[in-house]
UniProtKB/Swiss-Prot annotation:
Primary gene name: rpl14
Location within or outside the cell: Plastid, Chloroplast
Quaternary structure annotation from Swiss-Prot or TrEMBL: Part of the 50S ribosomal subunit.
Keyword annotations from UniProtKB, A to Z: Chloroplast, Plastid, Ribonucleoprotein, Ribosomal protein, RNA-binding, rRNA-binding
Record-stated family: Belongs to the universal ribosomal protein uL14 family.
GO biological process: translation
Gene Ontology cellular component annotations, sorted alphabetically: chloroplast; cytosolic large ribosomal subunit
Organism expressing this protein natively: Amborella trichopoda
Function: Binds to 23S rRNA.
InterPro entries linked: Ribosomal_uL14, Ribosomal_uL14_bac-type, Ribosomal_uL14_CS, Ribosomal_uL14_sf
Record protein name field: Large ribosomal subunit protein uL14c
Keyword Glycoprotein annotated: no
Main location: plastid
UniProt xrefs under Pfam families: Ribosomal_L14
Length: 122
């Protein structure tokens, strides 16, 4: 569960390394965000000489959470970190690569470009 002031790792090569959530956009619960929810975040740590800079406000979609995700078939998924992928206003990823595994629920939420870039979808 991601809420305001939560720090997240960035799972792509957009130039940001660490984000802090400042607002949850379009989720069923406006207080907590889960996998597949879009958040507004500020970049807390960035790679030098990249398009995204520190203290820039961006949108991101959550791809991994430490909080368990229970599927309809009974499988429970839990990741080691909270991670997000930086997206543009249309929902396309800003980076060209995605690192680590992501949840398959993103495919049903129309983030198919992120799913196609991921090395492992679970």
């Amino acid at each position: 569960m991601i809420q305001a002031q939560t720090y997240l790792n960035v799972a792509d090569n957009s130039g940001a390394r660490e984000l802090m959530c400042i607002r949850i956009v379009g989720a069923s619960n406006p207080r907590y965000a889960h996998i597949g929810d879009v958040i507004v975040a500020v970049i807390k740590e960035a790679v030098p000489n990249m398009p995204l800079e520190r203290s820039e406000v961006i949108r991101a979609v959550i791809v991994r959470t430490c909080k368990e995700l229970k599927r309809d078939n009974g499988i429970i998924i839990r990741y080691d970190d909270n991670a997000a992928v930086v997206i543009d206003p249309e929902g396309n990823p800003k980076g060209t690569r995605v690192f680590g595994s992501i949840a398959g629920e993103l495919r049903h939420l129309n983030f198919t470009k992120i799913v196609s870039l991921a090395p492992e979808v679970f």
